[in-house]
């Protein structure tokens, strides 16, 4: 989960996270697990309920907010991959050698799912959950056959696929609003970062260590986060924009794309102007204006999350027209700094116009630009079908998904061997589960994930202890 950079109060940041689509989909998944496991327990008993709960857990990772029409395609691959893996582990039983010969190559193939990017990673996790939690099932101790245990597992997966598809339809309207709000928060963070570039020397004199260390790196990171956020929002908001509320949200998303384009276009002008001291007063004024616009965009996002009508603000255009420009340099070749500064001010003015228009559309004071929505919605939506083309490009040593899959398979093999060699009694799946949820494509991401897992485990233990 990407948290946009903000200077908001921690309580407000917490409220945004608590109301986000990440928490909403988590609540939906938890409710589905409770309903399915509880229902199976009442009808078939505790062992069937435990196996069905594992099926639900294995089906959960691909369950993300998605267009209604593509939801089933998003979930079914986890069932197709997870069922044979679960049965294979159950069929092998307690034979440690055969089990190792299954889980190591299966882990390699599962982690190759990263070839499909953000769509494939949840499928990889789902496959690994099917393997790991199948090891944890005490099937033989209960006197239940491998096939019957797998049937309970399949029951849980199947019921959750149905539940998640229905839940996605029910929550679709809320997902649209929250995805747009998250996109607005991301673009507000990018506006703040871009504003900091206007007076980089002034920023370096402050205590903002992030600006001093790597302003360009942070800018690139937030641009990448915004691109991911925009694509996820496009897929949901631009699906069947037929009702007035959907058209309003889709129109606002298209305007957000235009704001992103204005921000990207201003980067070159900022780089050329930041070292011209004669234009520093203008750049300081533009920075303040852009930061004020970022606050207005954040307020708009908060209003969408809370279901309130956003409050309009006064245009900054009059203040921009009163800026005092430095004199032109006659000896300059090409565009002078004064011309670049005026162009930059004009782009900030366009951002002001788009922000005003966004709020007007959100309030219902102005209709969305339906012509833009109709012209672009099919072009921006990602395909929902699966293709084998990413797999064909994997088989070379410099392919990151292939190298990640090899690292993962070696880590799983090492962890499994260590768990068997430990002198005290242990459960091998504990080690394998830790590797699966922590290992990422780079060492830095793995360390970050490890720290998050340690903190999450500690927090969960405290909460569980408090409940007990």
Spans of features found by a protein language model:
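N-terminal loops that bind phosphate or other acidic moieties
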Residues: 87, 99, 243-247
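Pore- and pathway-forming membrane helices of multi-pass small-molecule/ion transporters and channels
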Residues: 2-11, 26-71, 75-86, 100-165, ...
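Hydrophobic alpha-helical transmembrane segments corresponding to the first two to three helices
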Residues: 397, 449-450
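Cytosolic regulatory and coupling regions of membrane transport/channel systems
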Residues: 1-38, 42, 141-145, 163-413, ...
């Amino acid at each position: 989960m990407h948290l946009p950079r903000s200077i908001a109060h921690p309580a407000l940041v917490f409220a945004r996270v608590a109301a986000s689509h990440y928490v909403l989909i988590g609540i939906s998944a938890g409710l589905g697990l409770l309903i399915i496991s509880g229902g199976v327990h009442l009808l078939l008993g505790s062992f069937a309920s435990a196996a069905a709960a594992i099926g639900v857990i294995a089906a959960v990772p691909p369950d993300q907010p998605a267009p209604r029409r593509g939801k089933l395609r998003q979930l079914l691959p986890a069932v197709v991959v997870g069922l044979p893996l679960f049965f294979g582990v159950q069929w092998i039983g307690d034979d440690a050698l055969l089990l190792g010969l299954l889980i190591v190559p299966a882990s390699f193939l599962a982690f190759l799912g990263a070839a499909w990017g953000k769509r494939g990673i949840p499928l990889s996790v789902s496959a690994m959950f099917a393997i790991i939690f199948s090891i944890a099932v005490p099937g033989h101790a209960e006197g239940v056959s491998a096939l019957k245990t797998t049937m309970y597992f399949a029951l849980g997966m199947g019921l959750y696929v149905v539940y998640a598809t229905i839940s996605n339809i029910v929550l679709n309207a809320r997902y649209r609003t929250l995805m747009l709000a998250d996109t607005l928060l991301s673009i507000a963070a990018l506006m703040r970062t871009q504003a900091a570039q206007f007076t980089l020397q002034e920023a370096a004199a402050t205590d903002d260590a992030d600006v001093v260390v790597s302003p360009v790196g942070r800018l690139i990171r937030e641009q990448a986060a915004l691109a991911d956020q925009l694509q996820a929002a496009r897929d949901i908001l631009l699906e069947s924009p037929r009702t007035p509320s959907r058209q309003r949200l889709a129109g606002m998303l298209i305007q957000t794309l235009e704001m992103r384009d204005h921000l990207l276009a201003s980067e070159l002008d900022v780089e050329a102007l930041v070292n011209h001291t004669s234009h520093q007063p203008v750049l300081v004024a533009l920075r303040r204006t852009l930061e004020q616009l970022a606050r207005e965009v954040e307020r708009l996002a908060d209003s969408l999350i809370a279901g309130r009508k956003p409050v309009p603000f006064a245009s900054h255009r009059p203040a921009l027209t009163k800026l005092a420009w430095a004199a032109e340099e006659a000896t300059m070749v090409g565009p002078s700094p004064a011309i670049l500064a005026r162009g930059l001010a004009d782009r900030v003015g366009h951002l002001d116009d788009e922000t005003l228009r966004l709020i007007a559309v959100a309030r219902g004071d102005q209709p969305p630009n339906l012509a833009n929505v109709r012209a672009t919605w099919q072009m921006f939506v990602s395909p929902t079908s699966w293709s084998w083309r990413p797999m064909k490009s994997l088989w070379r040593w410099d392919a990151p998904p292939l190298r990640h899959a090899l690292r993962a398979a070696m880590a799983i093999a090492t962890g499994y061997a260590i768990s068997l060699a430990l002198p005290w009694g242990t459960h091998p799946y504990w080690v394998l589960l830790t590797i699966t949820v922590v290992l990422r494509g780079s060492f830095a991401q793995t360390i970050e994930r490890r720290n998050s897992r340690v903190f999450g485990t500690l927090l969960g233990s405290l909460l569980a202890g408090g409940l007990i």
